[in-house]
A protein has these predicted regions:
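Conserved donor-binding/catalytic core segment of Leloir-type glycosyltransferases
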Residues: 4, 183-214, 223
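Donor nucleotide-sugar binding/catalytic pocket of nucleotide-sugar-dependent glycosyltransferases
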Residues: 38, 133-179, 249
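Short His-centered aromatic/hydrophobic patch
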Residues: 91-98
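Short alpha-helical donor nucleotide-sugar binding micro-motif in glycosyltransferases
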Residues: 137, 252-253, 260-265
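Nucleotide-activated donor-binding/catalytic signature segment of Leloir-type glycosyltransferases, i.e.
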Residues: 233-253
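Acidic donor-binding loop of glycosyltransferase active sites
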Residues: 263-278, 291
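Short hydrophobic beta-strand element within catalytic cores of glycosyltransferases
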Residues: 288, 292-297
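Conserved acidic donor-binding segment of nucleotide-sugar-dependent glycosyltransferases
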Residues: 308-321, 329-335
């Protein structure tokens, strides 16, 4: 069995690319031949790399980026040249370039379509892409979703439920920077630390997370890691609300710094407000470190499925700052409650969201094609 992961770009920028890469490395480590074909978003990444005897990374030249799609004719022609080399092509959606490459190639083998999310923001692009997207859905032998919630909620998949299967995303447990975490605990000594991580963009709902600090006393501090276009307005919100001592924007964090903040925090918050966030990988990273999660009940999203309500944490309505604050208090102001959520968050991670479990389930899906 020889597999090709097809989609997005390299180096890794987000969750879809990470899943592709983890599947390639995980499957090849299990003895399954698995390559990856993608567009390079940096010139120095163009080329082919043999990662091990069963895994090759092929990054093709691209000449422009439109919305979240790299335009790469080279990817199309490469797919056409190698179309007979693979038993299964595992294409990751949303990525119109990957879909176009598959269509152009004339590939005749089995197709696994990994439906990470609907196209929500780029509505004009969707109008152009819709016929090709419909072709891809019909062409797929199996459609893989990251949560049962998203598979059922997507309007594009309502007529093909008989060929859908759930494959939850899995990650390796965080290797916490213990010294870094201890230093942060000392820096915020006596504080209940709430951590959040992601790009500073509207759908992350950070303005509501910041506003929740108005409902908390001075024993709380909210730390938000990541950069993005909303940095200035969010800083202005913090200053105008007089929350400088309660809310900190940390900016870009290195991988080591991220693990230190995960280790130091008492609780992780995912305040997203739109179904653009379909899963929330950061939640399972937090769970792997034994941290309870407060997340939002976004209609049609798998976020609140990942964070089991009153098991690994608490889910609240989106855009409700007071509800976020109340959830923080309920978890952090009762030691028994906190310990129970912490233990259950860890158990949920090890039961459902490890990288090993994702790879094992993926192999089962392939074998059933």
């Amino acid at each position: 069995m020889k597999i090709l992961q097809l989609g997005k770009f390299y180096p890794i920028r987000g969750g879809v690319e990470k899943v592709m890469y983890d599947l390639m490395t995980g499957l090849s480590a299990m003895g399954v031949s698995c390559d990856m074909l993608c567009a390079a978003c940096e010139k120095e990444e163009v080329g082919e790399r043999q990662l091990n005897e069963r895994a090759k990374l092929m990054c093709m030249r691209s000449f422009a980026k439109v919305k979240a799609t790299m335009l790469s004719p080279a990817m199309m022609f490469k797919m056409r040249r190698i179309r007979k080399d693979y038993d299964i092509v595992h294409v990751h959606h949303p990525d119109p370039m990957a879909c176009l490459a598959l269509w152009f190639s004339g590939y005749k083998g089995k197709v696994a379509l990994h439906w990470h999310s609907d196209i929500i923001k780029q509505r004009k692009l969707l109008k152009l892409y819709k016929p090709l997207q419909r072709w891809l859905i019909n062409r797929a032998d199996v459609i893989i979703g990251t949560s049962p919630v998203y598979l059922k909620a997507s309007p594009w998949l309502r007529d093909v439920q008989d060929k859908t299967v759930c494959l939850p995303i899995g990650v390796v447990p965080l290797d916490v920077d213990v010294e870094g975490a201890a230093a942060l605990r000392e820096e915020y000594k006596g504080k209940k630390i709430i951590f959040s991580l992601g790009r500073l963009v509207p759908y992350k709902g950070y303005k509501y997370l910041i506003d929740s600090a108005r409902h908390l006393d001075n024993s709380y501090v909210i730390l938000i890691g990541g950069g993005g276009p909303l940095k200035t307005p969010l800083l202005e919100q913090i200053e105008n609300s007089g929350l400088q001592d309660k809310v900190k924007l940390l900016g870009f964090l290195s991988d080591s710094e991220v693990t230190a903040y995960f280790g130091a925090c008492d609780l992780f918050c995912m305040s997203s407000v739109y179904a653009t966030v379909a899963f929330g990988i950061v939640q399972i990273e937090a769970m792997s470190a034994g941290k309870p999660v407060v997340a939002t009940k976004i209609p049609g999203s798998g976020v609140s499925w990942v964070n089991a309500h009153k098991e690994s944490g608490i889910n609240v309505e989106p855009k409700d700052s007071a509800a976020l604050a109340l959830a923080f208090k309920r978890i952090l102001e009762c030691e028994d409650t906190y310990n129970a959520y912490s233990e259950q968050a860890s158990q949920r991670y090890w039961t459902m969201f490890t990288k090993a479990k994702m790879i094992e389930k993926c192999v089962e899906i392939y074998k059933n094609l």
